[in-house]
Amino acid sequence: MKKIALLVITTISLMSCDTKSNGHNVPSNATGYTIDSSANTDLVRKAANALVNNDTTTYKSCYTSDAKFYENNDSATLTQNIAGLQAMHDKGIVWKLNKIGAIWETIYLTPKASGKTSYVISYQNYTLTRGGKSIVVRFNVLNNIKDGKMMAEHLRYDNSGIAELMK
């Protein structure tokens, strides 16, 4: 009986040390937690689908009006990003989303200086086609999200094939 009482007390003590956040148990010394499915991961999927459908209205609705895009060594505003995508579309380049591989969200318990608390990381695989020429481009994407909108997007990918398609 003493062992059962000791087990119950130990269990209660350990449970009371955890911080609950959005239904997830988070240790008291954690700075945040990671989940594999959320409204924010759905938002990233929504933007990816809008991109391949050339639906700029839906695409823009996923971002704050002052969103910044950091692609490899360049940066752009939302307006500049959409203009670049439109230029590709005007050249006849068609985007196809092959898959979004791994995708997860990291949520920080204390907002960063900019107010960001959520970061969605994803690996996105697209085929870009122009005429009879196709290339596969794999994007490593980090989206900074605040209040259900993406405020920054960091992309890393090999853009050499895209330059060839644009010629």
Give the ranges of each region predicted by the language model.
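Sec-dependent N-terminal signal peptides
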Residues: I4-S13
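Short, low-complexity N-terminal intrinsically disordered segments enriched in polar/charged residues
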Residues: C17-T57, S61
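A solvent-exposed, acidic/Ser-Thr-rich amphipathic alpha-helical stretch
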Residues: T57-K112, K116-S118
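Exposed beta-sheet edge and beta->alpha loop/turn motif
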Residues: S118-A152
